Amino acid sequence: MSISRRTLLTASVSGLSLLGLAACTRTTPTPATPTATPSTMPTPTPTPGATGLPEPTAFARSDWAGDPFARGSGSFLRPGATTADREALARPIQDRVFFAGEATSADRPGTVAGAYASGLRAAGEVDRAGAGSERVAVVGAGIAGTAAARALRDAGHDVVLVEARADLGGRIRAAGGTGWPHPAELGALWIAADDDDLLRDAIEAAGITRYGLALVAEDRGPDGAVLGPSSAGSDAVAAARAWALAQPGAVSLAAALRETGGDALPTEGGAASPAARLAAILATDVAIAHGAAPDELSGARGLDEPAPVGNVAVTGGFAGLVQHLLRDQDIDVLRESTVSRIAYGNGRVGLRLGSGESLSVDRVVVTVPLGVLQEGAIAFDPALPSSHDVAIRALGPGRADRIWLRFAEPFWSTTATVWTSYDEDGRFTRWYNLMPISGEPVLMAEVGAEAAERVAAMDDEALRAAALRSLAPFADTELLATPEPTTTGEPRATPTP
């Protein structure tokens, strides 16, 4: 397998073969925890699938790019973009229109920590721009919007929170129910253990449980053999980034890899070859962390931004943080209310809702995801300044999704928690073994970029089958024993071939 130009452009496909109220209320809003395509089987008896692996007893998946109120899982830097574009998007317009959300975070984009901090930042800007208590609208009830709404209410403002969905939380969403030992988070899941002080304090105040997962990596080839450590892939990416930084113009990561020999790495050794190691990094670390394919991502700056994967998993349900922020707050909440137009040129701000109703406020905080802004779902009058428009176009909407599987019994014996599977089809998949968190056989895969698009095109049955194929290298044949009758009528365990 050579890392050709086509491979560089499509490496992120490699994950799985596949592979976040019409009326006004003054009550404490309680975000639901929707079950996004979960399925639970009536008995825990494992049923062998086509791969010889047992069928999962519970299943859940996300599709953030297909969500009309998300249009992506996060944001990334296209070629030529820098963090200055995020800062430009975050700037207030005429002290009337303010922006928040992960895409406006210069230091932690794509994370709950970045979104939460951006909501607090925008609330502070609104408070400083006004004179006393004002009527403020917050568009979007994700973590940025709810953080802004709570901070504004604490500062004495009259706040109305406008959310397009029936449920609050935005890209905080989970599959729950009896099929899962803890909520299967389809959007936000990880937080860092180090310096997320603001977010950590809020999570602790909300009483949400967390688990520090030891990230122990293990890579396996199609035959199940453990692959030894190699720096070939990371060295190739580092060389490409260094070359891109030295160029006067904008170049993609794919172009930088071609210029530095990434398309000519040796293929001898199959899954252990330098070429395969580079393809694995592009399909997992790059595609999942940034939601972008190599030809979409800035070669110079795209990898500067920290990955949204930390080493602490939220196990008590991230939706509880939204509940906590809005609990006992005198905040108007408009559910199932899309905003189609924001007019801000006459000293006030007018919001036109999809229902045809209008809302007049002093200022507005817009927290809708980048993909929604790019789609033009909200018309601004007057049009956004060119600096904001350029920033919106310079950033890319990330595409990353999750698939969760629960089994009746584990079919693996490795204690590693971060798996990279190189299956017989030559595809790479990143899996997390979450048994240390819950004590239950739960696995979670993450896919990004074009792999996420392929996942979205699969129905549940095809996706489960693809997931099991990608897990085959980690199966322990001794744990896949099937009962076979003996001459005495007693069952005898025979390993499944």
Stretches found by the model and what they are:
Residues 2-497:
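FAD-dinucleotide binding site
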